[in-house]
Amino acid sequence: MLKTRVIPCLDVKDGRVVKGVQFLALRDAGDPVEAAKAYDAAGADELCFLDITASHEARGILLDVVQRTAEACFMPLTVGGGVRSVEDIRALLLAGADKVSINTAAVNNPDFVAEAAEKFGNQCIVVAIDAKRVSGPGEAPRWEIFTHGGRRATGLDAITFARTVTARGAGELLVTSMDRDGMRSGYDLGLTRAIADAVSVPVIASGGVGGLDDLVAGVAEGHASAVLAASIFHFGEATVAQAKAHMAAAGLAMRLDP
C-alpha cells in the first residue's frame, strides 16, 4: 500500500522564504536552504518550493537555492512558480529538483504538459490547479480554475481541466483551494475529492490546513495521496513527526521514522 506523503511548502521570493519559519534551530529563518534542511531532518516526505518572484531575472537566484538544497537534503524536491518553457524545466531538474510544478503555462497551453512529459517523463511533471468554488447555494458544486495567484478567472472547469492535463501526461496534481488558502479552516474536501476521483494520478491536497485533523480529512475524505501544509509547520504549531503520528493513529499508511 502506498504511504501518504506529508509535504511542507515554502514560498520563496527573491531567494528568501516569505512566510516566516519559526524553527528554533534556524539561524536565519529567511533562508530557504536552512528551512529545507530542518524539514529534511524532521522527516518530511517531500518539500515543495513555490517561487512567487515576479521578475524573470530572479530565476538564477532560485536555481541557486534549488542546487544548494539538493546538495544538502535527501528528500525529493518539487519546484514551481513561473515555469513557462521546456528550458525552465530542464534548468530546474539539472539544478536538482525531482519534480517541476506547472501552473499558468498548463492553463494557457495544455499541450505544453504533453511536451514536458514526453521530454522528461510523467513522474516529474506536476500540474498545479488553483481553483475557486463558483457554484451558489443549492447548486451542484462547481469549481473554476484561476491563475495569477487567484486574481485571474479562466472560465475553465477544474474537474475537466484536471482530466485534460492528466490525459496530456501530468504525473501528479497539486490542488489548491483559493477559497481556503490561508483561512485555516481545512481543505476544500469536495474539490479535492472530485478531482482525485476523476483522475488516475496522485493528488496533493493544498490550501487551508488549520490543524492535524485537517491532514487526516484530506486523505480519508478528500481521497488525496499527499497533504501539503505551510503555516502549521512554519509557525511551530506542529512538527512533521507529530503530523505523521496523528495520521497513522487515524489509520492512514505513513512512513514513520524509527
Swiss-Prot record:
GO molecular function: imidazoleglycerol-phosphate synthase activity; lyase activity
Pathway: Amino-acid biosynthesis; L-histidine biosynthesis; L-histidine from 5-phospho-alpha-D-ribose 1-diphosphate: step 5/9
InterPro entries in alphabetical order: Aldolase_TIM, His_biosynth, HisF, IGPS_HisA/HisF, RibuloseP-bd_barrel
Gene Ontology cellular-component terms listed: cytoplasm
Keywords: Amino-acid biosynthesis, Cytoplasm, Histidine biosynthesis, Lyase
Major subcellular site: cytoplasm
Active site residues according to the UniProt entry: 11, 130
Domain of life (superkingdom): Bacteria
Pfam family, one: His_biosynth
Catalytically driven reaction(s): 5-[(5-phospho-1-deoxy-D-ribulos-1-ylimino)methylamino]-1-(5-phospho-beta-D-ribosyl)imidazole-4-carboxamide + L-glutamine = D-erythro-1-(imidazol-4-yl)glycerol 3-phosphate + 5-amino-1-(5-phospho-beta-D-ribosyl)imidazole-4-carboxamide + L-glutamate + H(+)
Biological-process GO terms, alphabetical: L-histidine biosynthetic process
E.C. no: 4.3.2.10
Family statement: Belongs to the HisA/HisF family.
NCBIfam families named among the record's database cross-references: hisF
Function: IGPS catalyzes the conversion of PRFAR and glutamine to IGP, AICAR and glutamate. The HisF subunit catalyzes the cyclization activity that produces IGP and AICAR from PRFAR using the ammonia provided by the HisH subunit.
Subunit structure: Heterodimer of HisH and HisF.
Stored PANTHER family: IMIDAZOLE GLYCEROL PHOSPHATE SYNTHASE HISHF, IMIDAZOLE GLYCEROL PHOSPHATE SYNTHASE SUBUNIT HISF/H IGP SYNTHASE SUBUNIT HISF/H
Name by which UniProt lists this protein: Imidazole glycerol phosphate synthase subunit HisF
